[in-house]
Amino acid sequence: MHQPANAPRHSIYYDYTVHQPWLPSEHPAQSLQRVVIAGGGPVGLTAALELARYGVPCVLLESEQQVCEGSRAIVFTRRSMEILQQVGVAHRVTQNGLPWRFGNSFYRGERVFRMEAPHDDNDRFGPMINLQQQFLEQYLVEACQANPLIDLRWGNRVTAVTQHADHAQLQVDTPEGPYTLQAEWLVASDGARSG
């Protein structure tokens, strides 16, 4: 039985919210889903919002019950910001992030490399912006929760996938035990160790 952390992570700069797990006993039997997304990080959340923009419903499975701890993604490029604008969260990123154009690398007190990104006055976004990943994830989570086409299931971990001719069958573990889910399409966005 999957038991994700159910106490807020400790942080001096971010207030973690623990979301209630989606439990199979509280929902009707599962029918064939159009799209299932495994992984509720920036890629999975953005994919769900993009699908919803085109009217495609999806189920988004996240093994944890809160957004990530620390930042595996902290710098977002202009192109990333354009995608985030499409899904409705770019304004929050620019409002709270730190934009920059220059970067320096130092070794033993001496600058050994300087990077300068081009920027035109007509560009909608700066070349890069820094924002901790948990803030970006929270903005994306809030957008997903506001969209009726997205079924966000916290505390649901994919443990096995079987490919069939016309669908995928997933074994999903939750804090109360496993259930089976079938999908016409499966998006694996559960990180570098996906498999």
Where are these regions (language model features)?
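Extreme N-terminal leader/targeting segments of oxidoreductases
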Residues: M1-V35, R53-Y54
